[in-house]
Amino acid sequence: MPRKGPAPKRPVIIDPVYSSPLVTSLINKILLDGKRSTAERIVYGAMEGLREKTGNDPVITLKRALENVKPSLEVKSRRVGGATYQVPIEVKPGRASTLALRWLVGYSRARREKTMTERLMNELLDASNGLGASVKKREDTHKMAESNKAFAHYRW
């Protein structure tokens, strides 16, 4: 850890189209090689597709998807006397959101649809309905934490 202490958290700029910091965070996660306009086109296209498919506000669908993907527990490796234990710990709210966005974008990229816009839209739609690979990742993470509950006393 640096001597000055942790770096201060920078505020997330609110998205001009949907007036939501969540959309800005999603754009930042999609961003590759500094091509913000491309990332914005992908995200806004996916949001419009969500609006057409669901008939609801896409930000609400995004929030529902995020809630379904956010983990509440995860495991961290802890070395105790030559053995490495997977210790379950609670996930802080900021990290939960970051992990959820990371998983949504990662599993969107792994999907089979033709364009990234379609992939992201369908992954968000699946996640908001409690389906999809990103929700499965959360369930697997919780399962790992549950199966290693015996090592919870090694928390730090």
Swiss-Prot record:
**GO MF annotation list:** rRNA binding; structural constituent of ribosome; tRNA binding
- Which Pfam family, any one, appears in the UniProt record? Ribosomal_S7
Q: Which PROSITE patterns match?
A: RIBOSOMAL_S7
UniProtKB keywords: Ribonucleoprotein, Ribosomal protein, RNA-binding, rRNA-binding, tRNA-binding
Q: Which GO terms describe its cellular component?
A: small ribosomal subunit
Q: Which GO terms describe its biological process?
A: translation
What SUPFAM superfamilies is this protein classified in? Ribosomal protein S7
On whether rRNA-binding is a keyword of this UniProt record, the answer is yes
| Domain of life (superkingdom) | Bacteria
User: What residue stretch is flagged as signal peptide?
Assistant: none
Family designation: Belongs to the universal ribosomal protein uS7 family.
Assembly and interactions? Answer: Part of the 30S ribosomal subunit. Contacts proteins S9 and S11.
What is the purpose of this protein? One of the primary rRNA binding proteins, it binds directly to 16S rRNA where it nucleates assembly of the head domain of the 30S subunit. Is located at the subunit interface close to the decoding center, probably blocks exit of the E-site tRNA.
- The identity of this protein, by name, is Small ribosomal subunit protein uS7
State the organism of origin: Streptomyces griseus subsp. griseus (strain JCM 4626 / CBS 651.72 / NBRC 13350 / KCC S-0626 / ISP 5235)
